[in-house]
């Protein structure tokens, strides 16, 4: 079959246009893919930074609440006043359990328990007693609630002398739940 000159030109131009469109389309797809991946990575990093900051602020708020709360306790307070203070501190900060233990053995908890405890023998009490500021414990199983917790402890001082220790339990399950509920592009944490 004989193809005329005009037909050859038309076929050549058509082939060049087709090849050009395929090459440009492929380059465009690759470019868009790169931009989408970069955008997705940036968005995920921004959300992660936001959530990390949010968790840090929550923890810092609770640590500061224990530090500030320790200034309110005094061995001369009545049992009712001590109990009101630990309950108020727990409810207003979202701390799962607040415990105030005095050197004379009295203790007040925001979580009701029929058991009597001598918290002065606990490692967290001994560590906080010699500290000058808030101390965070390692993760441990709380004997009162049975939950895994991290505790913020602060010595309570009167006239420069330690008269007790204030503790606030932060449940590990709450932190894990908060992290699990974080949503990112394409899934969850």
Where are these regions (language model features)?
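Extreme N-terminal signal-anchor transmembrane helix of membrane signaling/transducer proteins, especially
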Residues: 1-34
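An N-terminal domain-start capping segment
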Residues: 9-15, 50-53, 106, 148-156
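Extracytoplasmic/periplasmic sensory segments of membrane signal-transduction proteins
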Residues: 42-135, 180-182
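Extracytoplasmic/periplasmic ligand-binding sensor regions of membrane-associated signaling proteins
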Residues: 108-187
């Amino acid at each position: 079959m004989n193809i005329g000159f005009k037909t050859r030109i038309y076929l050549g131009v058509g082939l060049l246009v087709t090849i050009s469109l395929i090459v440009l389309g492929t380059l465009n797809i690759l470019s868009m893919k790169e931009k989408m991946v970069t955008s997705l990575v940036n968005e995920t990093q921004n959300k992660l930074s936001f959530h990390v900051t949010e968790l840090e602020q929550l923890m810092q708020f609770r640590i500061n609440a224990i530090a500030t709360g320790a200034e309110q306790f005094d061995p001369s307070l009545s049992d009712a006043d001590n109990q009101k203070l630990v309950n108020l501190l727990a409810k207003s900060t979202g701390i799962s359990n607040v415990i105030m233990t005095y050197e004379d053995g009295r203790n007040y908890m925001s979580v009701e328990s029929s058991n009597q405890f001598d918290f002065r023998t606990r490692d967290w009490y001994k560590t906080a007693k010699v500290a000058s500021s808030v101390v965070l414990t390692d993760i441990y199983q709380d004997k009162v609630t049975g939950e895994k917790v991290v505790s913020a402890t602060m010595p309570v001082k009167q006239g420069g002398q330690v008269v007790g220790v204030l503790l606030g339990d932060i449940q590990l399950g709450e932190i894990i739940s908060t992290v699990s509920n974080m949503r990112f592009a394409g899934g969850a944490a």
